[in-house]
Each structure stands twice: as structure tokens, then as C-alpha cells.
Amino acid sequence: MTMKKIFILLAMTFLSTGLFAQKFPGLARTPQMGWNTWNKFQGNINEKLIKETADKMVELGIVDAGYVYLNIDDCWHGQRDANGFITENKEKFPSGMKALGEYIHSKGMKFGIYSDAGRQTCACFPGSSGHEFQDALVYARWGVDYLKYDWCNSKDLNSKGAYSLMRDALYAAGRPVLFSICEWGSTKPWLWASEVGHSWRTTGDISPAFNVGVNYGDWTALSVLDILDKQDTLRKYAGPGHWNDPDMLEVGNGMSVNEDRAHFTMWCMLAAPLILGNDLTNISKETLDIITNRAMIAVDQDTLGIQGLKYRDDGDIEYWFKPLSNGDWAMTVLNRGEKPFNCTINWKDFDFTDKLSGRSTCFGSQVYSYKNLWAPVPANAKAAKTSAKTAAKTLTSSPLSVVIPSHDVLALRLTPKATKK
């Protein structure tokens, strides 16, 4: 009997006992943060790029800001060996994945990798279908901490079954792995994936476009606003250990500074995984300031783990709230329009109870202090500088008037103060 057949028999035995029918607990108690190769580099990846990126993540303070996963997406694969075990592309990764994982770990980071539930990946490299337990064992030997698992070339597969099988394989291999389900929302994974993975994609792929998607002929990549519009009804499914994933960040990949700031802010309001996808070896100060904004990241990483809600939609202007720990709230006003918006907030107009969390804003009886989470803002956003000065830190006992530039946000953190007498 070949080694492959022995391994498959062992895997079937494990499954029949039900010993591995769970994901790893304790992971992703807040949304995962890291960097991924795909959005910027796609298949143009190699060992040198990964090591340089790891070095930059440490040097620039990106790891200290919370981005601990360095994830290699599609196109790392070689072929399967004679026993069916996956290998890396030795031309791209001459030292091997195990050595590369050790390098990433030496930087205080975690190592992520990619595969696909189908026979082939999206770029037509070997997928994991029929080799789930073998691949999981290889990943464990390489020291992998994160698996993004795609859904290309998956015709005739049952999504829940296919993802559950890889979940069980990862658990059987014995190394804790954050399992990122990339099924594009096609079979409503929010209804079944909380016991299978730690996050699940809710839509198709994102593009570096704020309000109009990018057409690639037989498919269209979605804009930031396209994806945002699909998230509000899904908030009840998210929470510690199981997150809605609106796809990786496009900050630094060609949108304006205002649009990058709005994109990052809204993903934080959604309690979304924050997975960077830009070139960290050639990053602007404006982009670095956005992705390392500790105050905004704290909104995303709040341990209460509640996804924000769109409270009011006035067309081009949206008002979002997110309950935070210790009675705090995050509030974001998003200007989707093409012109600056003169915004006046009369706080009592936003007195409501969030049914999901049971929390009430109580602006009629509770005074909050608030601070602008983007103060100071980049120097090229002249209108926003006035906003930052106006809303630096004050109380909700008086209205707030600010100017929000086109495709930009006002983001506030509200902290309760003494109750009115």
C-alpha cells in the first residue's frame, strides 16, 4: 500500500470518529490583521519580496500596530510529489516554505498561505480537493498559521462540506491555523460558516476603486462602496471568532487619500479583518498614516466584537454607529458624494437603541465627550483640517458643525461623561 493510500485511510478514520469536527478555538477573537500578496502583486511573488515585506512591516511599525499575519496568496505552488504531497515553486522560493515561515516567525509575525477547495486554484495551480489532509499536514510542517481557502474550479462541490473537510484536516494536523473562508458569499456562508472558519468572504473580489467596479470581461471586481452596501444586513452573524469579511484592503493602491481614509474607516466600523494589500517597500507617508492609525484600529479591534450599523441613509451621506466597550460608541459620517458636505449634527436626532447589542445612545440624557479619530488629517485635505480643528474634542451638549470633503469621512469616538441632572 502506498504512503498516499495509508494517509487517506487514516484521514477517513479520523473523520469517522468525529474527533476533528471543529475549528481551532481561541483564534480571531478580534478581526485578524495582516498583509497579503494578491491585491498588488498577484502572481509576481517570490522569496525576496516576502522577506523584504516582513522587514518593512517591522521597520515601519506595522507589526506594532497589530498586523501580525504575512500571507502568501495564489501562485506559490509547485507540483505534487509522487505521494501526492504539495510542494512549493523552487524557482520562486528556493529556500523552501518551511525556511520562509521560520524567517517570518523570527520577525514576531505569523505565516499565512493560500489554497483552493477545487482541483485547481484560481490561477490554475494544484488545489486541495482530494488532498485536504495531506495539504494540512504539509502546512503544519511548514509552520503555517493562517489559511486562505478559495472557491475556484469547485463545480459540483458542496461549499459547507468542502470547507468543513479542510477545517477537519487542519484540526487533525494539530497546528492552530486561522481558517479564512474565501467562498465569495455565493452560498451565504454567514448562515453556516461560524462553526467552520474564523471569517468568511461576503462578496466577490474588491478592486482599487471607490465607487465604480472594474470590469474584466467575464467578471467584475467590486468597488469599495459596492461591497459596503452589502454588509449592513449581515452584522448579526459577526462576533469574536467568526467575522464577516468584505475582502482585503485596497489602501495605497491608487485611490485618493480621502478615499483610502474612508475605505479604511468603514472596514473598521464593520469589525472587518484588516488585511493590507499594497506595496510596503514603496509606501507613502499618507498611506502609512492611514493603516497605522491606532485610534481607528482600536475601533475595529474592540473586544465587544459588534459590527457597526448604518443608522441613517441620506443618499450621498450615511451615518454609521458601532457599539464599543466601556459604553463608548464610534460614529462615522460618510460622504459618498462628489461635493463637500456641510454637516451639522444635532445629537438628539441620533437617539436610538441598537437591537443587536441592546445599547442605547441616550443623547437626550447622556453627555459624551468626543474626539476626531483622523485629527490631524493629511495636509493636502484642506477642508478636513478645519473639520479636525472644530471637532478636536468637545461635548455632545452642543451641536457639531463640520465640512466633510468628497469621498471622505468624519469619524468620532464618543465616551460617556456625567449624566445630566
Language model features with spans:
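Carbohydrate-binding surface patches
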Residues: 267-270, 275-277, 313-354, 407
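Aromatic-lined carbohydrate-binding/catalytic grooves of carbohydrate-active enzymes
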Residues: 53, 57-156
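Structural recognition of the beta-strand scaffold that forms the well-ordered cores
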Residues: 27, 31-37, 66-72, 110-115, ...
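Glycan-recognition surfaces
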Residues: 131, 178-279
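Bacterial Sec-dependent N-terminal signal peptides
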Residues: 1-22
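Catalytic cores of secreted or luminal carbohydrate-active enzymes
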Residues: 261-311
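C-terminal beta-strand-rich structural cap/linker in extracellular carbohydrate-active enzymes
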Residues: 389-421
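N-terminal module-boundary/linker segments of secreted carbohydrate-active enzymes
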Residues: 22-51, 56
